[in-house]
């Protein structure tokens, strides 16, 4: 097993590295992860997406290698577009407890269908 595979397989989300946020100002962190992959729970075929993560930290920020490893743990999992983005959102919201957070998964088209999933802490339900 190569070292990258080992790091991904051994990654434990419970021990995701987070750092204290010592900044006194409010600011937004924007992270783009253009190589997201998970497997379709029905067919097992790979699904690819770009993940856009934005958040306004409160007391904590995520270490960038930790978010990369966490995102890469999805590559061998059979999980839907919706479930993967909701899981990423919930995990980061619970770990970081940010003032505001948004996670968007922009999935590559499959079978002429393009899907974008968005979770955000200020979601307003349309009437």
UniProtKB/Swiss-Prot annotation:
The catalytic residues are 40, 47
**Catalysed reaction per UniProt?**
7-aminomethyl-7-carbaguanine + 2 NADP(+) = 7-cyano-7-deazaguanine + 2 NADPH + 3 H(+)
In terms of Pfam families, this protein maps to:
QueF
Cell location: Cytoplasm
Q: Which GO terms describe its cellular component?
A: cytoplasm
Molecular-function annotations in GO: preQ1 synthase activity
Keyword line: Cytoplasm, NADP, Oxidoreductase, Queuosine biosynthesis
> InterPro entries, per this entry?
GTP-CH-I_C/QueF, NADPH_dep_7-cyano-7-deazaG_red, QueF, QueF_type1
Q: In which pathway does it act?
A: tRNA modification; tRNA-queuosine biosynthesis
The answer to whether keyword Cytoplasm applies is: yes
The residues listed in the UniProt record as binding substrate, with positions renumbered to this chain, are 62-64, 81-82
BP terms from Gene Ontology: queuosine biosynthetic process; tRNA modification
Q: Look up the domain of life of the source.
A: Bacteria
Entry EC number(s): 1.7.1.13
Its annotated function is as follows: Catalyzes the NADPH-dependent reduction of 7-cyano-7-deazaguanine (preQ0) to 7-aminomethyl-7-deazaguanine (preQ1).
Entry similarity comment = Belongs to the GTP cyclohydrolase I family. QueF type 1 subfamily.
By what name is this protein known? Answer: NADPH-dependent 7-cyano-7-deazaguanine reductase
């Amino acid at each position: 097993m190569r070292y990258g595979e080992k790091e991904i397989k051994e990654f434990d989300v419970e021990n995701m590295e987070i750092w204290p946020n010592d900044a006194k100002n409010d600011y937004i962190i924007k992270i783009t992860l253009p190589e997201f992959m998970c497997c379709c729970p029905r067919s097992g075929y790979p699904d690819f997406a770009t993940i856009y993560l934005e958040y306004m930290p409160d007391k904590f920020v995520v270490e960038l290698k930790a978010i990369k490893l966490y995102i890469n743990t999805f590559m061998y999992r059979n999980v839907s577009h919706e479930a993967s983005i909701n899981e990423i959102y919930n995990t980061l919201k619970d770990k970081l407890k940010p003032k505001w957070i948004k996670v968007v998964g922009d999935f590559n088209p499959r079978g002429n269908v393009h899907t974008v999933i968005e979770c955000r802490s200020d979601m307003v339900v349309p009437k």
